[in-house]
Amino acid sequence: ADASPNIEPADTFLERHGLAGLSATDVIETLEAMPVAERPANLLASVRPDEVVLTDDENNQASMPLPDDQFYVSIAPYASQTHDCFFHSLTTCRGELANESVQITITAADGTELAAGTYTTNDNGFVGLWLPRDIAGTITITAGERTVSAPIATGVDDPTCITTLQLT
């Protein structure tokens, strides 16, 4: 069985991995935007609804709380190939459509537009969005002539990684 991780302060962990001084939101945004080839192979960063959990290849672990009012969701629309995922891994998750332009609209159940615009997927094939916590609504993604719509939610039991949106 795996040994229990060595839990350490986030500052100590971040400094050792070249992320010194970054907030939890900065860690997420930095790793998400990093070209795949430059991502640290010895670092796992798992985005949970309320924290980001960092683990390295020496079994050190740190966690950083996320803002109380925000929920990070990373979305990888796809045409033909995807993977199952629930908590987004900033260093290992890969989506099919890397560096592609997509239109995304997210509308809350009450009709409020939470996000709308043209986004470019990161090198890992994902678009990461900060949304209000505890909402439910609909996400629509369009890429070229293909579109997909699906429910989306940002509660404590909801996924931070959405890989089920097939463009048709």
Tell me what each language-model feature is.
Residues A1-T12:
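Short, low-complexity, disordered segments immediately C-terminal to signal peptides
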Residues A10-D69:
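N-terminal secretory signal peptides
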Residues M64-L66, F71-Y78, V156-T168:
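Extracellular beta-sheet/turn segments enriched in Thr/Pro/Gly and aliphatic residues
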Residues T82-Q103:
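Short, ordered, surface-exposed loop/turn motifs in non-cytosolic proteins
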Residues T121-L129, I139:
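Glycine-centered loop-to-beta-strand initiation motif
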Residues I135-G144:
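A short, solvent-exposed beta-strand micro-motif common in secreted/extracellular proteins
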Residues E145-A150:
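Short acidic/polar inter-strand loop motif in beta-rich domains
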